[in-house]
Regions:
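Short glycine/proline- and aromatic-enriched beta-strand/turn motifs that initiate or cap beta-hairpins
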Residues: 23-80
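Extracellular loop and loop/strand-boundary signature of outer-membrane beta-barrel proteins
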Residues: 37-46, 80-89, 134-140, 197-201, ...
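Outer-membrane beta-barrel transmembrane domain signature
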Residues: 136-221
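Bacterial Sec-dependent N-terminal signal peptides
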Residues: 1-27, 255
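Short loop/turn motifs that connect adjacent beta-strands in outer-membrane beta-barrel proteins
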Residues: 24-25, 59-70, 104-116, 158-164, ...
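Residues on the lipid-exposed face of transmembrane beta-strands in outer-membrane beta-barrel proteins
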Residues: 50-62, 96-106, 120, 147-155, ...
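Transmembrane beta-strands of outer-membrane beta-barrel pores
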Residues: 32-38, 75-81, 122-130, 168-174, ...
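Residues that define the transmembrane beta-barrel architecture of outer-membrane proteins
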Residues: 46-53, 88-96, 114, 139-149, ...
């Protein structure tokens, strides 16, 4: 009798665990593209060149509620030069985003399953830009913390194993580190001259958008992902302008 009771309890526990289980989707991608870079703290010129990035995109979804926990990690390097080709700018950035998305649509379109989730995320960015021409103030630090609305959708093409995915996010409010116009890093860190260097931001001062359109397809018993990433980072604070507008082709695998 005790053994039967223990078995029943084990079955109930396993059943409860199954109800709370999460479906996970992990994608690892590499991107290559072209970027347009401007940072008026370093130079009034636009710089154009190659952008390379690594992207880790993870979604864990509760089976019972379909609530999604989303993580995005991205490392990026770029090498750019102006039209005059006198000098270069080298940049490196790391991004991390963690968010929660709730289901807002689950329907069938043309016999294919279509789902949409929406929510918000906490985003962190850390990086640098280095200008090879500048003797004074040759580098610029990039540090930002944002709250961003996020939306994603997926469509399963009927009678195939193809899945189209789309995701977009844009920072709504946040904090941004920036020197003021004409202020050196020596003044900030050695002399301690604070001059509005931690700047509250809104969508008006940092009109930024990152979106990703991909296609998942099976090949050799694996699932691959190809697509396009548009990443448009912009800011106008402390009488300084910055933008990094990048178009990338991405390719990777889904697990």
């Amino acid at each position: 009798m005790k053994r039967a009771t223990h078995r029943l309890m084990a079955i109930l526990v396993l059943g409860l665990f199954a109800l709370q289980a999460s479906a996970q989707n992990k994608a690892y991608m590499f991107g290559i593209g072209n970027t347009n870079l401007l940072d008026t703290y370093l130079s009034p010129q636009n710089y154009h060149g190659l952008d390379l990035r690594y992207i880790s995109h993870r979604i864990s979804e509760k089976d019972s509620t379909h609530l999604q926990h989303r993580q995005l990690f991205m490392g990026e390097v770029s090498l750019t030069k102006p039209r005059s080709e006198d000098g270069k700018e080298i940049s490196g950035m790391v991004y991390y985003s963690y968010g929660w998305l709730w289901p807002i649509m689950n329907t069938t379109i043309a016999n294919g399953k279509f789902r949409m989730h929406a929510g918000g995320a906490i985003d962190f960015m850390l990086g640098f830009i280095y200008n090879t021409r500048n003797g004074n103030n040759p580098a610029q630090a990039k540090i930002a913390l944002n709250l961003s609305p996020v939306i994603n959708a997926d469509y399963h093409i009927p009678n195939t194993k193809l899945v189209v995915n789309y995701e977009a996010s844009a920072p709504l409010v946040g904090l941004l580190f920036s020197p003021n116009y004409g202020q050196s890093y020596y003044e900030i860190f050695s002399r301690g001259d604070y001059d509005h260097n931690i700047v509250p931001t809104t969508i008006g001062t940092t009109p930024t958008l990152r979106h990703l359109l991909t296609l998942d397809f099976p090949l050799l018993k694996k699932t691959f992902r190809i697509g396009y990433m548009g990443d448009y980072q912009q800011a106008k604070v402390n009488n300084l302008k910055y933008h990094a507008r990048t178009h990338s082709f991405v390719i990777g695998m889904v697990f």
